[in-house]
């Protein structure tokens, strides 16, 4: 459990500005392929409230239960909060390359939701922020996804990966984009969850 001092919102909370804290929540969140895969694999647990009973490799993934529970809470809150979850062509290319037809169709359905939400927006001009050499520690694939998140004016980039969030502070400082795991986003939402239940 986070205390106010440990919370990512501690600056705002300490100033007694709950409205400012609420307004600072990421509302347009890019879903990377690792997050999409977990949403697909554990859809029953996340969307239907089924018990989390991982098998095989998933049973050995440290912290997976917490991340799946965080996704469940995020999407429960989103039933009323109406945050935007962004899926783009770069994500879709990665998914199609996995050659899993049912998963691919599911991601197309998620993409359709985003296309409806973003209807009327002009497609962004592709940026080149992540081409800069000081982002060299980020993989080419992650750089493409992060760039699309920036291009679509996302507030946050959600990933289940462990490596990319280690660069979160640097990425946010350089670009304003917040890279976070589901548990991090859930911690940001926690003070406001009752507004949406």
Per-region residue spans from a language model:
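Acidic, PIN/NYN-like endoribonuclease modules and their adjacent C-terminal/linker elements
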Residues: 2-22, 43-53, 135, 146, ...
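Short, flexible loop segments at the rims of nucleotide/cofactor-binding pockets, characterized by
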Residues: 6-8, 61-64, 132-138
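Residues that mark the start of a beta-strand
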Residues: 26-29
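PIN/NYN-family metal-dependent endoribonuclease catalytic core
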Residues: 31, 36-100
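Alpha-helix capping/helix-boundary segments
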Residues: 35, 91, 144-145, 163-164
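Acidic donor-binding loop at a coil-to-helix junction in glycosyltransferase catalytic cores
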Residues: 141
């Amino acid at each position: 459990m986070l205390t106010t001092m440990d919370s990512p919102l501690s600056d705002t909370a300490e100033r007694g500005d709950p409205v400012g804290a609420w307004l600072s929540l990421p509302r347009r969140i890019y879903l990377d392929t690792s997050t999409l895969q977990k949403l697909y694999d554990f859809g029953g647990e996340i969307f239907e409230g089924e018990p989390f009973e991982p098998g095989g490799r998933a049973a050995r993934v440290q912290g997976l239960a917490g991340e799946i529970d965080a996704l469940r809470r995020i999407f429960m809150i989103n039933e009323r909060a109406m945050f935007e979850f962004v899926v783009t062509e770069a994500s879709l290319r990665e998914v199609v390359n996995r050659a899993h037809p049912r998963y691919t169709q599911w991601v197309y359905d998620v993409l359709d939701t985003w296309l409806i939400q973003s209807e009327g927006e002009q497609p962004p001009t592709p940026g080149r922020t992540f081409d800069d050499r000081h982002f060299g520690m980020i993989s080419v694939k992650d750089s493409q996804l992060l760039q699309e998140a920036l291009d679509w004016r996302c507030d946050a980039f959600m990933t289940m990966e462990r490596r990319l969030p280690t660069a979160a502070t640097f990425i946010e400082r350089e670009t304003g984009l917040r890279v976070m795991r589901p548990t991090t986003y859930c911690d940001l939402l926690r003070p406001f969850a009752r507004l949406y239940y």
